[in-house]
Every structure is written in structure tokens, then in C-alpha cells.
From Swiss-Prot:
Belongs to the bradykinin-related peptide family. The keyword Transmembrane does not apply. This is Bradykinin-related peptide Pnor-5. Vasoconstrictor. May target bradykinin receptors (BDKRB). The lineage of its organism: Eukaryota, Metazoa, Chordata, Craniata, Vertebrata. One of its GO terms (biological process) is defense response. Expressed by the skin glands. GO terms for molecular function: toxin activity. It is found in: Secreted. Keywords: Amphibian defense peptide, Bradykinin receptor impairing toxin, G-protein coupled receptor impairing toxin, Secreted, Toxin, Vasoactive, Vasoconstrictor. GO terms for cellular component: extracellular region.
Length: 8
């Protein structure tokens, strides 16, 4: 998932 590094 490309957005796996985005903050949550």
C-alpha cells in the first residue's frame, strides 16, 4: 500500500 507510510 503506497499510503502505508501516512500518519494515522
Amino acid at each position: 500500500r503506497p499510503l502505508s507510510w501516512l500518519p494515522k
